[in-house]
């Protein structure tokens, strides 16, 4: 009986998460279009390179709302940084796109990210490279990020607690 109740509870939680993910699709698509618009506006600074379609696709496939407290679609995909706790923020989507693009990482690369935060940047990178090693100095953030990344199946991301200055 207890196993059945646990299974039902798990199914209910999974269904709720899937429904929320589906609800966020329009906000995620709007975020990608906002990034494209910023790239056009900043073309005089970025040059003809802009932000690659691979990066935009990765961001369009990554559930940003799963990496913010409360998992609110409107908050997660807004055009600005979002508080994630411990006095830290998840970067504005355009900044994530720009950093990811400027890294120019290739599929066979291993990337070291310093400052895991919520894990969102690592998740975006994980769609583009073979392996992401990320280091976070604030244990509660590292633990939360590792949990979300594992829950979402990012098996190519390794989260470590430590001072990124030490590598």
Predicted regions and their residues:
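Conserved nucleotide-cofactor-binding alpha/beta core module
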Residues: 104-167
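General helical structural elements
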Residues: 7-8, 32
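Residues in and immediately flanking transmembrane alpha helices
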Residues: 16-17, 65, 126, 149
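Hydrophobic h-region of N-terminal signal peptides that target proteins for export
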Residues: 9-18
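Positively charged n-region of N-terminal signal peptides that target proteins for export
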Residues: 1-5
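Class I SAM-dependent transferase core
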Residues: 20-112, 128, 143
């Amino acid at each position: 009986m207890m196993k059945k109740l646990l299974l039902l509870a798990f199914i209910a939680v999974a269904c709720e998460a899937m429904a929320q993910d589906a609800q966020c699709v329009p906000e995620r698509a709007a975020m990608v279009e906002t990034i494209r618009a910023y790239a056009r506006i900043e073309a005089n600074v970025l040059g003809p390179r802009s932000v690659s379609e691979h990066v935009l696709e990765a961001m369009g496939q990554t559930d940003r709302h799963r990496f913010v407290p409360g998992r609110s679609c409107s908050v997660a995909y807004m055009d600005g940084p979002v508080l994630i706790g411990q006095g830290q923020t998840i970067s504005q989507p355009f900044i994530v796109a720009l950093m990811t693009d400027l890294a120019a990482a290739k599929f066979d690369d291993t990337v070291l990210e310093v400052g895991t935060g919520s894990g969102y940047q690592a998740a975006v990178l994980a769609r583009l490279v073979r392996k992401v090693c990320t280091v976070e100095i604030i244990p509660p953030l590292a633990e939360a990020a590792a949990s979300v990344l594992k829950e979402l199946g990012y098996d190519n991301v390794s989260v470590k607690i430590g001072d990124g200055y030490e590598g």
